[in-house]
Amino acid sequence: MKVHCLSQSAQSPCFLLEYKNVKILLDCALEISSILHFLPKNLNYNNNNNNNNNNNNNNNNNNNNNNNNNSYSFKEKDKELNQFFKNINGTLYIDNGCSNIKYNCPQFEMIDDFSTIDMILISNYTNIYALPFITEYTNFQGKIYATEPTVQIGKLLLEELVQMDKQYSNSSINNNNNNNNLSDCWQNIEILEKLNVHNVGMENENLYRDSYRWKDLYKKIDIEKSFEKIQSIRFNESIKHYGFECIPSSSGYGLGSANWVIESKGFERVVYISDSSLSLSRYPTPFQLSPIDNPDVLILSKINHYPNNPPDQMLSELCSNIGSTLQQGGTVLIPSYSCGIILDLFEHLADYLNKVGLPYVPIYFVSSVSKAVLSYADIYSEWLNKSKQERAFMPETPFLHQDLMRKGQFQAYQHVHSNFQANDPCIIFTGHPSCRIGDITTLIKLYDNPKNSILLIEPDFDFKSTVLPFSKQISRIQFLPIDPRINFNEANLLISKLSPKHLIIPRIYKNYVKNKHSNGNFGIVTTILPLDTIKIQNNQNFESGFIDKELAQTIQTKVLDKSSQLKNNTTTTTTTTINNQQPIHVAEISGVLSMSDHELIISPPNISDSNKIIHIKEKFIWGTLSIENIIKAINSTKQFKNNGDSIEYFEINENYYLIKISSKNKTNNNNNSDQVTNIHLSPQNVNIETSCETTRRLISDIVLLNCNGFYV
């Protein structure tokens, strides 16, 4: 078994599992944080915006640059770099006027031929963003499996991203209408090499080292074609494919989010866990433990990015900040994804506003897919927790946002230009959480006021890199990541219950995650890095397969019970068991072993095959040896009698004998010499020590004829 890590980081999982000539791709997430390297649209920057004091020293003849000035040295040395990159407080950003957004895909270069990939298993809608790159831009022809909410909501989120990306691209074209020849030139290898030379020894040294492979986003038509190829499944539904059984179970993270069990015909069992939550108070179906119990191999990824910030604590701080901002007459902007933790927040915030006496404050949800997401959330009641399912059986919707809409406290808009008129103070949820694309960039400019707040709640984006381009903003910006995924302590508790024999984790989890079982034993832990390939030893001694129906009808089985008495197994005879042990059924089969769709099949041989089988037929011994019968057979053997051989028997201990046969050997010189054959005999084993091949064959035949079992 091999596991290839195509991921760029632990937060963008993509693994290739190779096992028994089957290749399974586990998730295909984009490294979405790469979007932070681009400047937001509709904002203008100068390289020296935040370095006026340093520029005043340019007239001095001091050539000793300090560390703060090193980050700006490329401006003086190479004006070409200044056309593509902007430096803000020592961090390089790609200018919003010279390029479209580029996206950091998994390391698909590790896969030589996508037609060899048998299937793709998707865990949730956050790990599906790279799927169109596979289905529409490679020769992939395999199967794709995901739960229905993952398919439907994932499609909405991808279409939303495409729309945001298109808006950014149009803005870049408008900003760069006089320099269209600069578009995407920053990815030129020579430009990046110059940048790396300038950044040696600095914080930005490796920032863009592999950015030459970043790609333009796919089109909406690609999403349509790609998602048509996905087969929707339900929790605990078994998929039997290529000799494997794949079963999804709830991970408790989001609508339809799943962990996967991949089992090889009852032998080795692989479990893949990504984006899981053990919380019982959230809206999704709770985490299911029993379906993923006792794995041989456990692949664990995408744990809580901020384990020191418990979700409940962050939620309390979020409400506190929202309350203080609203009481001062300010508006709260919350950049977020259009599905996920946001569904928890709508109801929680409405309840909080009522408690603090602010029920009149409206909550706005601005997204091109806002209404569709809210509709799906109500439709997929069977994918929700028990309390919300019970509401669905009543004449009520599972979520409260419909009630809030009727009260006028909650409103959904397609975008800020669709008759959106906010009544301040208010709370506005909109995308994108990176603050690089989407309506949030417009609203940040619109609400640039010290009484307003921008609260960043999504954990996927680094706070410093996110807010640096907005360093001139006077509104308050705070980072309150709400990450419901399991933290390291919960991961260790989960691992102790699952008791995996082999645990595979990203390298950054090495010091925090242990493979300690509930019984105190420790399992194997293997860490993996991007581009790594690890091999896992396969201890399986047998392989399951099928027998052709025609061949099966010709099989005549025989039974070996505990006492090894040979019995015929007929349709009218019932085989009894001894001491509650099942008897062993054995039979001789002559057939041809072949593989079809990764499944082994034994079929009847044709004429040419039959001739080959006769010549390569082997013998296999079953059962135990009858010491008494073997001794009698040796005594009655005519060859030993005719030669006058001496036969002696020594009982070493119970059921263990030494038989010594001495015979006269006449040489060419007519001198007689003794030839000794020693036979070590027990019910389970026989060793023949002799220099005479004729004697060895004779004794071997006697042993085979006196085996209390069945041999072929």
Curated annotation (Swiss-Prot):
Residues 47-73 are annotated as: Disordered. The keyword Transport does not apply. It is found in: Nucleus; Cytoplasm. GO terms for cellular component: cytoplasm; INTAC complex; integrator complex; nucleus. Residues 47-70 have a biased composition (Low complexity). One of its GO terms (biological process) is RNA polymerase II transcription initiation surveillance. Component of the Integrator complex. The core complex associates with protein phosphatase 2A subunits, to form the Integrator-PP2A (INTAC) complex. PANTHER family: INTEGRATOR COMPLEX SUBUNIT 9. Component of the integrator complex, a multiprotein complex that terminates RNA polymerase II (Pol II) transcription in the promoter-proximal region of genes. Belongs to the metallo-beta-lactamase superfamily. RNA-metabolizing metallo-beta-lactamase-like family. INTS9 subfamily. This is Integrator complex subunit 9 homolog. It comes from Dictyostelium discoideum (Social amoeba).
